[in-house]
Amino acid sequence: MTGESPGRADQQESSGETTEPNETNSAVEAPAPTGGRRTLLDELTNPPPPPPPPPPETEEAADRTPVNPLKTWLPVVLLLALVFCVVQALRPLPAPTLKLTVASSYTFGGERPSLPWPAEGQAVLEAEGLGRIGAFGEQRPVPIASVAKVMTAYVILRDHPIEQGDTGKTVEVDRKAEDQFGSGQTEGESVVKVTAGQELSEYEALEAVMLPSANNIARLLARWDAGSEAAFVRKMNAVARELGMHDTTYTDPSGLEATTVSTASDQVKLGHAAMKDPVFAELAGKTRYTDLNGDVQQNVNRLLGSGDVVGIKTGSSTRAGGNLLFAAVRDFDGTEQLVVGAMLGQHKADILDTVLGRSDTLLQATLRALASDTVVRKGETVGYVDDGLGGRTEVMATEDVRAIGWGGLKVRLSLDAPRNGVPHAAPAGAPIGTLTVGDADSAVKIPVALGRHLSSPSFGSKLTRLG
């Protein structure tokens, strides 16, 4: 064919290829890319195949499907809250307590009393449950004569108690007690006539010791109780230590020996202890008795029966001078106040009259200085019940409270729960405890009552309880 390039035709023929006519021969297929790269023409004419579909979901994969946290934890929280509420509601309630709201002490107005103390020796005055009213002189051990018999009687009654109205055990009189009656009369001792083989009641033997101050009977009781006077004296000193009588030494049961020494302060301690025994107090206050022989024996303490004096014991000797351990009881609006005092070493003649007169002057001035004050009035709020969970219920005095004291004295107030404890619930006006003013036997106690209804703690209080 004229004009056709002979080179191209020769190449086709030499390769042995034949060209088939194509209806779309207007489009020429592009050669494959080299080196695995796709050209722009490839991208335009032959787009890449779609990605393969994901593999089917397995059961393990399904377990890892995310879960809503609210759905997981809400039931747990609700369960814990329910358990908490149940536990709080069922926990044992704390024991209710009484709390005092008025002042815990009361001070009497006025000045401390100025008392007529003796010009010699030593003296001490105390009010039972209130404390020391005053003291005079150096508290050093001095002979106390027959005041020692207070300890003798106290030890006998401690070792061999007597019921009120009874006479106690039987004490057989020995030969020594009979002989000491005769020798005692010769030497000017206080003695009572007895005969060996006689039987004295324990009560009558103590009467002989406390009223006519019989030395021979004091020694008889010592031998009867302990087997010997020396053994009994050891008991006396042991009891003295128990009572805190550290400046006291007993060397005989009668007090005749000047080596039996004590102080006014120590004897007042013994007086307080001894007067707690009703039989001792009865003996100490007797003015006379009739003995086994029909003789009337007098108490040498002439103060008994006047000026509220109820005891206790005299003692006199040349070495000791005049000595007296005394007690008085005065009634203040229905409350009995015991006052115990001791005066030692009064040597002005007549020594017994001197100590009795000076003691009476001192005692009566002391009793005049005592007064009764209204500390709390009926209906006054004195405290509250604390239920332990924040609840409070007022507590009121059911009557006036009067305390005994003297100028400047401070007495203590306390609010005490009943023995079986404070209840969790009670109606208004129910007794709920005791208000105490003072201490020991002179303390005044009145019941206190609820000012309004006492209710058990509410569910809300139980729920919010932390402790």
Q: Model-found features: residue ranges?
A:
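Terminal targeting segments of Actinobacterial cell-envelope proteins
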Residues: 1-70, 74
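Hydrophobic membrane-insertion alpha-helices, especially the h-region
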Residues: 73-89
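Conserved SxxK-family serine transpeptidase/carboxypeptidase catalytic domain
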Residues: 90-93, 369-467
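Active-site-adjacent loops and short helices of periplasmic peptidoglycan-processing enzymes
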Residues: 93-265, 272-281
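Solvent-exposed coil/turn segments that connect beta secondary-structure elements
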Residues: 128-130, 159-160, 174-178, 224-226, ...
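A penicillin-recognizing enzyme superfamily signal
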Residues: 281, 285-374, 382
